[in-house]
Design a protein with these regions (language model features):
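Conserved catalytic loop of SAM-dependent methyltransferase domains
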Residues: 160-185, 194-195
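C-terminal lobe and adjacent flexible extensions of AdoMet/dcAdoMet transferase-like proteins
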Residues: 183-238
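Class I SAM-dependent methyltransferase SAM/SAH-binding core
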Residues: 24, 28-75
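A short acidic, Gly/Pro-enriched loop at the edge of an enzyme's catalytic core
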Residues: 73-85
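Conserved class I S-adenosyl-L-methionine
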Residues: 113-143
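A short glycine-rich, Lys/Arg-flanked "PGG" loop and its adjoining helix->strand segment in the class I
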Residues: 98-113
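Short alpha-helix
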Residues: 131, 140-163
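A short SAM/SAH-binding and catalytic strip from SAM-dependent methyltransferases
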Residues: 83-98
Length: 238
């Protein structure tokens, strides 16, 4: 899956602004996640595993310079083999976002971590996404709301650990305007009453323990003994 316009956008003032927030937020999110295998799916131009303490860190995507070239909806990794999966903007630019999540659930170990970066449709960025007809990145994506994404994750057995909003500055194209509106980033959504244009969602794959019901042999033994016929003593008449 090659995303048209992505390379150019990453080098714009807007792209650099988003990358800066996402990189810092991801560094904090994965710093205390431990294990043996970490995987970044998509957006190989950015290293979102740079702060991970996990020894084996790989990038996988459908195009670009990566460790593994593959379809994100059919991952070539064994089930229950990965401790951490990072999904930076892979869902909103995929034709089968739900299948990607199913594959992620399959390869994650129980209690494994999933961290998603996405554009928020309920924001100023989402408003531009709705009305921008240029077809350029990132305005042509199918943004996923947090409510919908949480529902999908719940159905797959994930528990949302935390969500972090970011990029409260309006989606201006010029760096001068991004700097002029930067005071909104500092205040965040606490003062302005609307969420940020980007979210980071951290979820954990939960495996609920099954209760194994075994036969109560003691009870059955007592029951069978109680039902056992007792030999009758026969009296002898004189």
């Amino acid at each position: 899956m090659s995303i048209p316009g992505l390379e150019h956008w990453l080098e714009t003032a807007q792209g650099r602004y988003v990358r800066e927030w996402e990189s810092a937020s991801m560094d904090n999110a994965i710093a205390d996640v431990f294990g043996f295998n970490a995987l970044q799916l998509g957006l190989p131009q950015c290293d979102f595993l740079r702060a991970s303490r996990i020894p084996l860190r790989q990038k996988a995507a459908e195009a670009g310079t990566v460790d593994v070239l593959c379809e994100l909806a059919a991952l070539p990794f064994a089930s229950h083999s990965t401790d951490l999966v990072v999904l930076p903007h892979a869902l909103e630019f995929s034709a089968d976002a739900h299948q990607i999540l199913r594959e992620v659930e399959r390869i994650l170990i129980p209690e494994g971590h999933l961290i998603i970066l996405g554009f928020n449709p309920i924001s100023l960025w989402g408003l531009r996404n709705r009305f921008d007809r240029s077809g350029s990145f990132p305005w042509h994506g199918a943004y996923l709301s947090l409510t919908r994404l949480k529902d999908w994750l719940k159905l797959l057995g994930f528990e949302v650990d935390r969500g972090i909003p970011g990029c409260h500055v309006p989606p201006c194209d010029q760096e001068a305007w991004l700097k002029r509106w930067h005071f909104m980033e500092t205040a965040g959504g606490r003062w302005w009453g609307f969420p940020g244009g980007i979210y980071l969602l951290h979820a954990i794959k939960r495996t609920h323990a099954m209760r194994l019901i075994t036969p109560n042999w003691r009870k059955n033994a007592v029951g069978s003994k109680a039902l056992r016929p007792v030999a009758q003593k026969e009296g002898h008449g004189r």
